[in-house]
């Protein structure tokens, strides 16, 4: 919510979201909404089924695969004459059901040169994941067979998910920008024992490699505890990797 400028948070002035705002201005803006499960896969399963996680059976990302035999929103719409599609992140450890067309990222998906799974194969696609998902979504919309049929499209972007790797054209976009801190950045935990007991270790839970883009060397023992370089540097072409490291080297 803080990241969408339509809600008026100060971050929205630094990084506005005009296209999302337009959807709100022309449609509806939810003021009292909540997320029943903030983890990516379970949240997606809840949206698909309209059920809480303990009811739809997908409670964590590394659980058994989502049960695609149960009733879902796309199945209902498909049965009522809608053309259905899902493009982008899926991460439900099972193939999509209820969709006439699907093209999903492999597992969590990669930011650079990601692998896409379709009904027939898994293929590596050169490019930045946000650009590719947008491109394939537009191609599906333009190439729909039933132009007069209603459609239901789920476009799931990877880029809201850590490790927040920008497109190369954005490496220096906010280099000299100071972002306002959220109100609870320096929260007070006195008298809140349960909150104190939650994992608060910055290195373990924040992943400095993910969030600060600090790479100490691909052969460093510290990489055993830092999943960030292995998460996407390996999918970059050698020249892409060099440009990325050069962009952050001086800042680190």
Where would I find each of the regions flagged by the language model?
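Formylglycine-dependent sulfatase
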Residues: 1-252
């Amino acid at each position: 919510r803080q990241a969408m400028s339509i809600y008026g948070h100060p971050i929205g002035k630094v990084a506005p979201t005009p296209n999302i705002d337009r959807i709100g201005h022309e449609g509806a803006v939810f003021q009292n909404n909540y997320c029943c499960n903030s983890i990516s896969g379970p949240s997606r399963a809840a949206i698909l089924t309209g059920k809480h996680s303990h009811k739809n059976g997908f409670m964590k990302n590394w659980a058994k695969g989502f049960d695609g035999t149960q009733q879902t929103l796309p199945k209902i719409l498909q049965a009522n004459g809608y053309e259905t599609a899902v493009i982008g992140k899926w991460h439900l450890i099972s193939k999509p059901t209820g969709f006439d067309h699907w093209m999903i990222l492999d597992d969590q998906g990669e930011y650079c040169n990601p692998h896409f799974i379709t009904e027939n194969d898994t293929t590596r696609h050169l490019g930045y994941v946000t650009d590719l998902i947008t491109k394939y979504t537009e191609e599906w919309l333009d190439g729909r067979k039933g132009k007069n049929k209603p459609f239901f499209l789920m476009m799931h972007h990877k880029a809201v998910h850590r490790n927040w790797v920008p497109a190369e054209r954005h490496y220096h976009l906010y280099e000299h920008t100071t972002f306002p801190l959220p109100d609870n950045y320096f929260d007070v935990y006195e008298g809140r024992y349960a909150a104190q007991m939650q994992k608060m270790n910055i290195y373990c839970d924040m992943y400095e490699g993910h969030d600060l883009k600090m790479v100490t060397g691909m052969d460093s023992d510290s990489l055993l505890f830092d999943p960030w370089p292995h998460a996407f540097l390996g999918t970059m072409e050698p020249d892409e990797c060099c440009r990325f490291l050069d962009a952050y080297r001086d800042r680190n």
